[in-house]
Amino acid sequence: TRTLDEIESKDMSIFISLIKHGLNAVMPSHVLYSAADKDPAGFSQFWLKNQLREKAHFKGAIFSDDMSMKGAVLGGEMKDRIVKALEAGCDMVLLCNSPQLVDEVLLQLDWKMSSESIERLLTMKGFKEPHIALKTSQEKGFKDMTAQIMTM
C-alpha cells in the first residue's frame, strides 16, 4: 500500500500537468487507495472534490467508469453506486455493459444536476459559453436540463 504522499507525488503530478495544459475530462477508476480513503476513487469525495477539484484545480467534466464493472460492486447496489458516484463529484455516470438496467435505474434515481455539472457537460458538447446556454434554457422554462443535454 502506497502512502498518500507517494500517490500525490507520482500519480497526481501527471494529472496536475495535464490539467495545466487544458485537460477537459477525466474518468476515475474503481481502484481503492486505502491509505487515502475507504472508498474507491470513483466513489470518493476525497479524490474527486478535494484532490481533483480543489487541490488540482480541475475544471473539466468527470465521467464515472462503468458502473456495471466488477470493481464497482464496492459501491453497493446499482442505484447506490450511481448516487455515490454523483455525490462524490461525477458529472456523468456511465452504465455501459448493462444497458437493460438504464431505464430501471433512471426511474429509481432522484437527482438534480448542479448548474456546474451542466455547464461542464455543455462544454464537452462544444458550447463555447455554456453559462449562456444554461441561462437561456432556464429562461425558456426547460425543467429537465439533463434530458436536454442528452439529446443535443
Regions found by a protein language model. Give the residues of each.
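Second-shell residues forming the walls of enzyme active-site clefts
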Residues: T1-T136
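Charge-patterned, long linear interaction tracts outside catalytic cores
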Residues: K143-M152
